[in-house]
């Protein structure tokens, strides 16, 4: 982690002399980096050099932007951003919404949710917003009932009815695809599912509705969001070109939200 932070710091310092023309953004590989690569040439033609730093966790992209090591990030949905700001008191600011990644239930051991046995172990993300989102999906699938059926911040302690006595195991989101051989099922964010070679539309036994409120957003800090280059990036990301790329590349597993 220290090595990665040092590399981000070095990257930020190396571009500081040309900040007006260089825009730095941290992103998780799939689909975020892939989407950013689509608009890179368009920004280049406008004199903007988009530098992308890849991350594989849900914390460092925000701290890097908050600490002014990067201008922007693109990896999280709105509820996660709101939760992070509340917990850390940072000056992160949403720039705009780009897409939705419906979260899904995956398993290497069963072919249908009705095949789940009593006491089965289900892995979910351990961060508050994605954990709550996973529990809401289990509730929608009819496997559990929550004390507050609409709470996006629910935890396993908020489960009111659990007829199968499911064992809810909380893991770091990037670890969930690797856990499939060890658990009966896992609820996995689409970016990590795709990155692991899973097809959300074919492999998920149950998937979130496409009208989910969990829109993935580009995020900056109070200084970076004032840059004209950030406005240019958002315009490029919310273009027909990007919408077509999302539709063609992900075939419904990722849905444009603009």
Regions from the PLM with identified roles:
Residues 95-144, 243:
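A conserved helix-loop-strand patch within extracytoplasmic ligand-binding domains
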Residues 1-19:
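Gram-negative bacterial Sec-dependent N-terminal signal peptides
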Residues 132-139, 237-257:
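Periplasmic-binding protein-like
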Residues 83-95, 110, 182, 187, ...:
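Ligand-binding "clamshell"
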Residues 102-113, 215-227:
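A bilobed periplasmic-binding-protein/Venus flytrap-type ligand-binding module shared by bacterial periplasmic
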Residues 54-58, 68, 72-82, 98-99, ...:
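Beta->alpha turn/N-cap motifs
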Residues 20-30, 48-54, 121-122:
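Short, well-ordered beta-strand elements
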Residues 53-63, 150-178:
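Short helix-initiation/N-cap motifs at beta->coil->alpha
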């Amino acid at each position: 982690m220290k090595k990665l932070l040092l590399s981000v710091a070095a990257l930020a310092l190396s571009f500081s002399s040309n900040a007006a023309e260089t825009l730095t953004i941290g992103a998780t590989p799939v689909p975020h980096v892939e989407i950013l690569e689509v608009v890179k040439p368009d920004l280049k033609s406008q004199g903007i050099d988009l530098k992308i730093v890849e991350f594989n966790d849900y914390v460092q992209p925000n701290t890097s932007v908050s600490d002014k090591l990067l201008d922007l990030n693109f990896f999280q949905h709105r509820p996660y951003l709101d939760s992070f700001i509340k917990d850390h008191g940072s000056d992160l600011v949403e720039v705009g919404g780009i897409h939705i990644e419906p979260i899904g239930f995956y398993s290497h051991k069963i072919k249908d949710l009705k095949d789940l046995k009593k006491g089965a172990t289900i892995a979910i993300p351990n961060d508050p917003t994605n954990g709550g989102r996973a529990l809401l999906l289990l509730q929608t699938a009819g496997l559990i009932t929550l004390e507050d059926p609409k709470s996006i911040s629910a935890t396993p302690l908020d489960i009111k009815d659990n007829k199968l006595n499911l064992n809810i195991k909380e893991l770091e989101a990037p670890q969930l695809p690797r856990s499939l051989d060890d658990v009966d099922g896992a609820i996995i964010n689409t970016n990590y599912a795709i990155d692991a070679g899973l097809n959300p539309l074919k492999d998920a036994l149950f998937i979130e509705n496409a009208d989910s409120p969990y829109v993935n957003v580009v995020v900056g800090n109070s200084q970076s969001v004032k840059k004209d280059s950030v406005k240019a990036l958002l315009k490029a990301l919310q273009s027909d070109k990007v919408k077509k790329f999302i539709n063609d590349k992900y075939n419904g597993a990722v849905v444009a939200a603009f």
